[in-house]
Amino acid sequence: MFKPELLSPAGTLKNMRYAFAYGADAVYAGQPRYSLRVRNNEFNHENLQLGINEAHALGKKFYVVVNIAPHNAKLKTFIRDLKPVVEMGPDALIMSDPGLIMLVREHFPQMDIHLSVQANAVNWATVKFWQQMGLTRVILSRELSLEEIAEIREQVPEMELEIFVHGALCMAYSGRCLLSGYINKRDPNQGTCTNACRWEYKVQEGKEDSIGNIVHIHEPIPVQTVEPTLGIGAPTDKVFMIEEAQRPGEYMTAFEDEHGTYIMNSKDLRAIQHVERLTKMGVHSLKIEGRTKSFYYCARTAQVYRRAIDDAAAGKPFDPSLLETLEGLAHRGYTEGFLRRHTHDDYQNYDYGYSVSDRQQFVGEFTGERNGALAAVAVKNKFSLGDSLELMTPQGNVSFTLEHMENAKGEKMEVAPGDGYTIWMPVPEDLALDFALLMRNFSGQTTRNPHGK
């Protein structure tokens, strides 16, 4: 039966290796200077070659992202800089700019090109156009519903389609955001996004003065005291002034009716419950977003979505426990995005801009070292004797209560203090620990206060 590709992020070689170990079929990584991951990118030429070689040795695929919106200066060096990357043998380039696509088609006609989500493909005519231009896959816009995706699949059956199913969402349309550039001169469309939409803002009512300028009415009031109305009350025609917490006196005008602490702060996408339907549609690739994400995130999302894809391909019903498993990842609240219609407050988090989980925290990475029945764990976050833990491996997961651990000298320990420590704990000797990770289950705590009561 048809089985879609599971496509994971690879901001680092380590992330890539964990994604592959836990079931990803392919990964994507940005090319230096020409992707939107300039600030969060380990992949220089040496690592790109390593990544591509390792992927192919495993029978997996590696896509290189070249989706920048270039100014003239970057056109001068583009083909020169891209040539060695193409020679490395990536399975495709992910691109958005028509001019760069034209140059690649002229100079490297054999190179597969996937249309980036930044190109904003929202209808079947656009998909058909890019098919006629020689592209082999289109990453559809996040703003599409399930019904619209199905219609595109029906109208253009020969074109490969890719859909985002998990990860952070931009408040800007298809990610084409100007906020970071406006506030601190870091252009998101040049790969230097500072996630300004996640910062804390204050809001106050504004008004139009006699010459048409928007000015504030009174002193700023912390927006935490303003009740959100979007999606649950009547729309407002008021004007609001927005002040970023670290830039007092600098105001931006907002004509929308978003009222909340982090008024531009989207919830995170989670569409695992729709994997079965997307599989039946014939969507070729299900993609996980991963800017600034850890190897633990890459491993956990790959493991969970691998299970969902395999179940869908085998004709098994969706397992709701997978939704609960994803709650163990720190997130800003989950949404189905635009796949189904919701009220606006289902898309946006009004309360906080950070990622948090009240289910689990990643606390350790198994190093692979063994001493009889004991195995070494590189501690990442504090945990203690008596804690409920989950040992996660590519072969399966095991939950248990920690009853014993010791240091390298064989001395018993009650607490693994945190990052930088190595402890030894009992693990069955027949359990393979390659890429094994350790999580602590919460009971009334969160990742923001993991040891509170």
Language model feature labels by segment:
Residues 123-125:
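Conserved nucleotide-cofactor-binding alpha/beta core module
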Residues 37-54:
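Glycine-rich, positively charged N-terminal anion/phosphate-binding segment
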Residues 99-100:
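Alpha-helix capping/helix-boundary segments
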Residues 1-21, 26-33, 52, 58-68, ...:
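Surface-exposed amphipathic alpha-helical tracts and adjacent flexible/coil segments at the periphery
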Residues 108:
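Conserved phosphotransfer cores of two-component systems
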